[in-house]
Amino acid sequence: MDWSSSYHSIQHRCRYNESVIDLVQIEPARKAPAPKPEWLKARAPVGENYHDLKRLARSLNLHTVCESAQCPNIGECWHHKTATFMMLGNLCTRRCGFCAVPKGRPEPIDFDEPRRVAEAVAALGLEFAVITSVNRDDDLIGGARIFALVIEEIRRQAPGCGVEVLIPDFQANPEAIQIVVDARPEVLNHNTETVPRLYRVVRSGARYERSLDLLRYAKELHPGGVTKSGVMVGLGEETSELFEVFRDLAGVGCDILTIGQYLRPSRDHLPIARLYTPREFAELKREALAMGFRHVESGPLVRSSYHAHQQAELATAST
């Protein structure tokens, strides 16, 4: 198929011309911050395992998305010696309105990085590793090869360890996607993040239909592989828009869906439109499961890699 030009099938739903003024008005500038509800309070990052993992990452010159993206689950995950390693440096070539990862001109790709990531995975004794990266629009094929190399290195240095890769869109480059899929990760994850109407503000440089076609193409290349995607809520979307995204993802064969609350990293990032309650997350999960996903992880603090190993096992068991 001509994957890179096959967006027209769903493009009629991508309402890019709608005004985004509501998004910037959803939180008054002078409004005092409300107390954080109990369901958004996470474990503080302390303890021996936390400090051991931090030292290991520093000693191998590695980055984790847990730190760079200010993940609220870092305390819980690092306590259990699980982390999401972020490759291709620590500078992203895009400026998404929700993301805390630093932006700028990245250094040349470090092709020794996969070996060091695998060394860390082996040292931690992980049974399941999650690997992601910044966007590297300056070198799409090189970025894809890094993912393939890290899968190969983990299987060499840590036999039996499963691998989930959370990949960027590679600007719809079929060769780049095939390089990653051919490496056969246990789970291939690519996040849609939000509803089409909000893409211009939330996901600078990305396209909703491109993300859907990436997931579709990955499933066509490897029908037996597990694919996954995630969305944030609380950015100004409507429930009906979320359900449309769920249906689109189910329609391209996506197996696992994660749904979590958007939390503003700083005043320089997009404001929060509203906080969803645990009950609302349960309702979203119920609706998504009815659409055919093998597994749905839905909750205020859910992020792409949260409970990733358990998600993969549950999705595989449901086949």
Where are these regions (language model features)?
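Short connector loops/turns at beta-strand edges and beta->alpha or beta->beta junctions
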Residues: 90-93, 126, 193-195, 262-264
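Auxiliary Fe-S-binding modules of radical SAM enzymes
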Residues: 2-3, 7-84, 115, 119, ...
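Core AdoMet radical
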Residues: 100-116, 123-175, 180-214, 228, ...
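A secondary-structure boundary/capping signal
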Residues: 67, 87-88, 132, 166, ...
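Conserved functional loop/turn residues at catalytic and ligand-binding sites
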Residues: 91, 95, 100, 125, ...
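Local cysteine-cluster metal-coordination motifs and their immediate loop/turn environment
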Residues: 65-77, 88-103
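Short, surface-exposed acidic/glycine-rich loop or hinge patches that mediate macromolecular interfaces
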Residues: 90, 168-171, 236, 301
